[in-house]
């Protein structure tokens, strides 16, 4: 079951908004053979020009679903977010099923909550001579091949992705090059 943590910036999350988000995004459960035990982190922010920004992150065992949308209408924005997340799930499941058939495995796409922690660095001690890290994230690396890592990177909308390479058991990084192609950095211990 997907549980929801919904937070509003400059906006009070009413029962109507909460119910609409839970109803729309909760429909993602139909894409799973076993309903995942996950927490959907939803952040809704309003701006002075009445525009809203909706961010949804659902960390699962094998993939992190993430979508962001800006819209003048909150409910239309939620609908667009739901469409983006559904496309991500369908794309990921298609790729996994294709890989399973190619390998002869009978893998089932099962999603569970992964532990993810974000910490914000205190900005009070800013010094022009120091390098300032403004955000720090901690997450567990998952074993996968480079193709899966590129898919995960694209699903998250990032320009790079760090993972444990199944073939080498080492930490690797895939990244999007300026020419639109992908690069792979493999690490080794010295």
UniProtKB/Swiss-Prot annotation:
Naming one, the record's GO cellular component terms include: cytosolic small ribosomal subunit
Asked if the record carries the keyword Cytoplasm, the reply is yes
Q: Where in the cell is it found?
A: Cytoplasm
GO BP term, example: negative regulation of translational elongation
Say where the protein is mainly found.
cytoplasm
Query: What SUPFAM superfamilies does the database record attribute to this sequence?
Result: Ribosome binding protein Y (YfiA homologue)
Q: Which Pfam families match?
A: Ribosom_S30AE_C, Ribosomal_S30AE
The alphabetized UniProt keywords are: Cytoplasm, Translation regulation
Q: Which GO terms describe its molecular function?
A: ribosomal small subunit binding
Instruction: Kindly give the CDD domains that the UniProt entry links to this protein.
Output: RaiA
Q: Which residues form the signal peptide?
A: none
* Superkingdom classification of source: Bacteria
Q: Which family does it belong to?
A: Belongs to the HPF/YfiA ribosome-associated protein family. Long HPF subfamily.
- Per its database record, what is this protein's job? Required for dimerization of active 70S ribosomes into 100S ribosomes in stationary phase; 100S ribosomes are translationally inactive and sometimes present during exponential growth.
Instruction: Tell me which NCBIfam families the record gives.
Output: yfiA
User: Could you describe the subunit structure of this protein?
Assistant: Interacts with 100S ribosomes.
Record protein name field? Ribosome hibernation promotion factor
Which species expresses this protein natively?
Staphylococcus aureus (strain COL)
